[in-house]
Structure formats: structure tokens, C-alpha cells
């Protein structure tokens, strides 16, 4: 329950923490302070927001000493539970919630039944594409919809803008879902699950349990959606009280979306309808077919016409940093897949192209790169440029499959220029790191934008 006169300490001044500051600033009786391990001088954007909203900043020592002055600790995603401030809060019996939960509590405080217009998407891969495509479906049908969460603005930031006539589709992560209390979407979906963020969750079972929280508060009035082709997600919605919807690249007898005779077909309310031939879907890549099916399934409980779904699928080409064509230079295509932050995502990227030079590496999240190395060899990737924290692990995996054509470089600039020098007309230079960006960049977006700026700086026609 949201307390509009509460005393909130926000832990973390990244995108989510800043969103929480902006959201809580709409309630004049709320008392808000912020803490972060970083010096405020090093996070100027955040400092400007604090100044604008007259929110004090506490260093780590001050926040621990003054913690008892607050009612609720709002943590940013990804901050581990062994953080000193979280540990102290638990000792004091203080509620610890995530920014996502704060946003939902504000929605519930302001609106009538906000859950009826809320869709949430999680999974290891495909979240951003699926979330954006759902937004496109609703916009094509004339609805007002916010695309938010990990893509767009944090829920807590938009929670005071949303009206009772707006829809919201959220991309949500395992970090956020681990700490929900009342969060309840009308439609909740898990796209797929492969090992990721094991450095944070500890093991795969913990990661899966966090993802499953997306169904935690659903009732019989809600809908739970899973990918029945994914052996890990299949059946995860059994414990959900929501109505079960499925999607598959194979024919289904249950309600949901699937492929039959090369057509996307929906089956809902005892009506089976063919929507579009899969070759007429603009979004490239076999893996994106799953994202299309998931997004289509999310529309079934709402009044989205088949024509609007069809027209959107003919026009939607994808999102930035996910198999994004940056430029074709002297016959060489440069593809930005900086969103490929884990092995499974990059495997799908590799399988989308032929005749490629790959750029990979980044923050070590505890991944096993053996399957990645095998795919590189089997696909016949011409060369691989490795950089970042994981270069040794990936190189070792490549050595074990007797793949010698890799080069270790210090930075992305060297990788891009080297790959371009090696490439010939018809080749693809693919940035798909299979790793997070945090060893060298603040986000995968900044890494992808740096890649694009390097590509645009290359000569040629």
C-alpha cells in the first residue's frame, strides 16, 4: 500500500532510482532522500534531478546512520541483497521494495483497477523486441499506451502521468521481480529462460524462481503466457491462478498463437484465425518469430483487430541495438547487436547471418562459453575479435574446439577497424558480445551507440 506521507530512502541513482525520485516528487507530503556508492560529482545527470526536486543525497555512511528515520527502502534493480544498507534495513524490520513495486503501488493509489490495463514481459532474451511490438499493436489500434520499465521510462516515473484510459506494457527483469509484493499485471508472460545473471542470483533455480514471480499475484481474471517450445518455461504458469495462454512455432490445440502451414494463427474463445504468412513478417530472424508470437498472444484479451496485427507485422523492423543494421560500406554490413548480453542471445544473432566477422566480449556474469564457441566454429565465422573482461574465457572456449581465428584487442575501436580491414564485400561485421557491458560501458545502449559512431567514422562509400 502506497503511503503518500511516507519517508522513502532510495538506494541507487541509476535510471530506476532517478525515476523513483521523479515519481515521489509528485507527493508533497512524502519525504525522500537518496543514497548511492558513487560520489554525486560522478553522476551529474542524477545530481541535476536531485537539485530540481530538492531531494537530499546521503553517502553510504550517512544513510546507514540515519536509516531509522525512514519508513521504506526503495532499491534499484541489480543491487545485491548483501548491500550494507539493505542488511541494516532488514535488521530494523524496514520494508525493502524494488522501484517496480513502488511504481505499481503509486498506480494503485491513483487509479481504479490499473492492473486491468497492464502487461508485463520477462524472459532471458527477446523482452525489448516483444515489449515494443506489443506497444506498436496497441498504437495501431488507436489506444494510448506507455512502453516502459527496462525499456523507456521506469514505472515509478510514469505512474503519476498514466490515466484510467491508458495501457502500460512493461519490460521487467529478474532483479525487479525478486522483490515484488503486490505487482499484478493483467497479462504476464515469460518468453524463455536460459542461464543468465547467475553471478547475482547464485544458481539457475533462483533465477527461475525470480522470473516466476511475474505470475505471483494473478487471479482468475488475469492471463499467464509462456513459450511451450522452451523446455524451461513450459509449465511455469501451472501455479498461476490466471487463465493460461501459450505460444509456439508448432501447431497448438490450446489457446494462444502458433505457426501452422507457415502462417501465424491465433486460437482464442473457440475461434481459430490465420493472421499472416510468416514470410510477410518484416522482423528478421527465426528467433524473432517467437517474439512475434508472444506479442500477438499478449493482445488476445484486448480489442486488437487482426488487421492491425497484420499491418503492424508487415511494418515493424525491430529495435535499436538488436540486430540493427547500422550501415553498409563497400558491400560490408555492420550489425549492432549490443543487446546480445548473454550467450543465448548471441547464438541467435550468429544464426541469423552467413559470412561474418564477430566482435564479442564484456562483463563476466558467470556464463559458460562452450556452446558459444561450438556455434562459432560450426557456423564458419571467419574471424572473432575479443575484448573486455571475458576475453580469456571466450578464447579458452575457442581453443577447446580448435578454432584459431580469434584476435584479442583492448577496445571496441580496434575491433571494428580490424574487422572492417578483414572483411570483403558480402561479409557481415556483427557486434554481439554475449556479455553485459558494465566492464567498459554504463549500459548496452552506450556500447551500441559507440559501435555505431565508430562505424560511421569509417571511410568509404
Curated annotation (Swiss-Prot):
Gene3D superfamilies per UniProt: Mur ligase, C-terminal domain, Mur-like, catalytic domain, NAD(P)-binding Rossmann-like Domain
Subcellular location: Cytoplasm
Gene Ontology BP, a term: peptidoglycan biosynthetic process
Known catalytic reactions: UDP-N-acetyl-alpha-D-muramoyl-L-alanine + D-glutamate + ATP = UDP-N-acetyl-alpha-D-muramoyl-L-alanyl-D-glutamate + ADP + phosphate + H(+)
EC number(s) given by UniProt: 6.3.2.9
Binding locations of ATP: 123-129
InterPro entries xref list: Mur-like_cat_sf, Mur_ligase_C, Mur_ligase_C_dom_sf, Mur_ligase_cen, MurD
Molecular function as annotated in GO: ATP binding; UDP-N-acetylmuramoylalanine-D-glutamate ligase activity
Top-tier EC class: ligase
PANTHER family for this protein: UDP-N-ACETYLMURAMOYLALANINE--D-GLUTAMATE LIGASE (PTHR43692:SF1)
Descriptive protein name: UDP-N-acetylmuramoylalanine--D-glutamate ligase
Taxonomic source organism: Natranaerobius thermophilus (strain ATCC BAA-1301 / DSM 18059 / JW/NM-WN-LF)
Protein encoded by which gene: murD
Amino acid at each position: 500500500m502506497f503511503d503518500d506521507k511516507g519517508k522513502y530512502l532510495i538506494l541507487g541513482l541509476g535510471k530506476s532510482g532517478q525515476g523513483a525520485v521523479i515519481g515521489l516528487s509528485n507527493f508533497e507530503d512524502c519525504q525522500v532522500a537518496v543514497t548511492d556508492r558513487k560520489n554525486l560529482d560522478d553522476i551529474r545527470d542524477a545530481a541535476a534531478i536531485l537539485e530540481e526536486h530538492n531531494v537530499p543525497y546521503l553517502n553510504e555512511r550517512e544513510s546507514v546512520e540515519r536509516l531509522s528515520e525512514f519508513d521504506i527502502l526503495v532499491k534499484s534493480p541489480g543491487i545485491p541483497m548483501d548491500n550494507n544498507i539493505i542488511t541494516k534495513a532488514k535488521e530494523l524490520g524496514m520494508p525493502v521494495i524494488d522501484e517496480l513495486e513502488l511504481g505499481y503501488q503509486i498506480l494503485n493509489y491513483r487509479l481504479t483497477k490499473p492492473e486491468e490495463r497492464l502487461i508485463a514481459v520477462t524472459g532471458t532474451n527477446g523482452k525489448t523486441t516483444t515489449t515494443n511490438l506489443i506497444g506498436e499493436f496497441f498504437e495501431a489500434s488507436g489506444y494510448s499506451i506507455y512502453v516502459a520499465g527496462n525499456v523507456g521510462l521506469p514505472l515509478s516515473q510514469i505512474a503519476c502521468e498514466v490515466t484510467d484510459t491508458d495501457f502500460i506494457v512493461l519490460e521487467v527483469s529478474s532483479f525487479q521481480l525478486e522483490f515484488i509484493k503486490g505487482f499484478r499485471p493483467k497479462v504476464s508472460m515469460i518468453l524463455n529462460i536460459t542461464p543468465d545473471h547467475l553471478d547475482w542470483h547464485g544458481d539457475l533455480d533462483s533465477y527461475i524462481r525470480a522470473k516466476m514471480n511475474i505470475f505471483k499475484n494473478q487471479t482468475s481474471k488475469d492471463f499467464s503466457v509462456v513459450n511451450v517450445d522452451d523446455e524451461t518455461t513450459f509449465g511455469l504458469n501451472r501455479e498461476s491462478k490466471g487463465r493460461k495462454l501459450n505460444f509456439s512455432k508448432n501447431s497448438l490445440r490450446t489457446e494462444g498463437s502458433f505457426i501452422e502451414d507457415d502462417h501465424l494463427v491465433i486460437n482464442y474463445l473457440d475461434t481459430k484465425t490465420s493472421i499472416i504468412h510468416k514470410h510477410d513478417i518484416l522482423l528478421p530472424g527465426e528467433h524473432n518469430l517467437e517474439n512475434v508470437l508472444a506479442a500477438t498472444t499478449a493482445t488476445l484479451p484486448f480489442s486488437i483487430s487482426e488487421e492491425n496485427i497484420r499491418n503492424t507485422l508487415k511494418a515493424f523492423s525491430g529495435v535499436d541495438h538488436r540486430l540493427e543494421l547500422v550501415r553498409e560500406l563497400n558491400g560490408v554490413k555492420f550489425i549492432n547487436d549490443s543487446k546480445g548480453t548473454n550467450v543465448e542471445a548471441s547464438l541467435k544473432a550468429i544464426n541469423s547471418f552467413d559470412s561474418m566477422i564477430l566482435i564479442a566480449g564484456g562483463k563476466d556474469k558467470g556464463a559458460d562459453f562452450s556452446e558459444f564457441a561450438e556455434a562459432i566454429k560450426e557456423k564458419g565465422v571467419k574471424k572473432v575479435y575479443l575484448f573486455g573482461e571475458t576475453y580469456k574465457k571466450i578464447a579458452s572456449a575457442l581453443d577447446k574446439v580448435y578454432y584459431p581465428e580469434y584476435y584479442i584487442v583492448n577496445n571496441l575501436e580496434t575491433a571494428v577497424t580490424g574487422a572492417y580491414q578483414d572483411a570483403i564485400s558480402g561479409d557481415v561485421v556483427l557486434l554481439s558480445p554475449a556479455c553485459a557491458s558494465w566492464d567498459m560501458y554504463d549500459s548496452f545502449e552506450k556500447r551500441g551507440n559507440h559501435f555505431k559512431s565508430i562505424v560511421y567514422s569509417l571511410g568509404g562509400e
